[in-house]
Amino acid sequence: MGNEFRVCDDCQATNIKTLVPKLKKVDSCATIEVGCQSYCGPGRKKSFAFVNNRPVAAPTEDELIVKIEAKLNK
């Protein structure tokens, strides 16, 4: 089973136009779902994505990508 990324297109700290291409670089075969994730509180302040149904958040997109890569390499 492949990886799954879920991101919100409505949260203030998430920029879909830049985040989705970065996620594709991390895993080009992963499923990426864009839509509300009901994670509005943290999503107002931090970039986040759900990686295989687990939330991962960081102050910046670049830090988020580093955390996601670390999570997938475990």
UniProtKB/Swiss-Prot annotation:
Could you identify this protein by its name? UPF0741 protein BC_5384
Organism superkingdom: Bacteria
State the family named in the UniProt similarity comment for this chain. Belongs to the UPF0741 family.
HAMAP family of this UniProt entry?
UPF0741 (MF_01863)
